[in-house]
Amino acid sequence: MAITSKMVKELRDKTAAGMMDCKKALTETDGDMEKAVDLLRQKGLAVAAKRAGRATSEGTIQTYIHGAKIGVMIEVGCETDFVAKNEEFCKFAKDIAMHIAAVNPIAVSREGIPAEVIEREKAIYVQQALDSGKPEAIVEKMVVGKVEKFIGEICLVEQKFVMNPDLTVQDLLNELVAKMGENISIKRFARFQVGA
């Protein structure tokens, strides 16, 4: 199939990828727009992984207050002040602050979850599985699955994004890294709730 400039522009508008990347993705997928979007997203993951080790000493702090009852402050880091002042970068930080207000994660990543929290949940799941009368081999698999699900619910980057449940927060972060062309990281956040 012949790849037209209109197709390249449409894909570029959807993904914010470079023109040559869009043309290459359309060529590789024989003009299939959806497959090209998926291919560019996969490449975005590779770009994010390549940039992950780079220092993020610039960034922004954004806040979100919901109904004067819940407040969130978040620090999102990047490599340059050019990106730190970018409207899309700041919107990303604000959107993640709203997400935190709604979903209440306890840590940015798995590494930030206190071991005692995971051990306490694991003990509960083991007891529940044993009480159900399942064999021990199955109990272990059930517990591993439940612990993984629990981590996905309390770990910010593994949570489904509230404004688009098809993506995780990490997916959004990877897309932004690919668009901005530099490493971006969610450094930390604080969530406050009246009466909590």
Swiss-Prot record:
GO CC annotation terms, alphabetical: cytoplasm
Keyword annotations of the record: Cytoplasm, Elongation factor, Protein biosynthesis
Region (Involved in Mg(2+) ion dislocation from EF-Tu): 80-83
Locations listed in the record: Cytoplasm
Main location as per UniProt: cytoplasm
Record Gene3D superfamilies: 1.10.286.20, DNA helicase RuvA subunit, C-terminal domain (1.10.8.10), Elongation factor Ts, dimerisation domain (3.30.479.20)
Domain of life assignment: Bacteria
GO molecular function terms listed in the Swiss-Prot or TrEMBL record: translation elongation factor activity
Record's keyword annotation contains Cytoplasm: yes
Keyword Cytoplasm attached: yes
Pfam families hit by this protein: EF_TS
Function in brief: Associates with the EF-Tu.GDP complex and induces the exchange of GDP to GTP. It remains bound to the aminoacyl-tRNA.EF-Tu.GTP complex up to the GTP hydrolysis stage on the ribosome.
Family assignment from sequence similarity: Belongs to the EF-Ts family.
NCBIfam families, sorted: tsf
Protein name: Elongation factor Ts
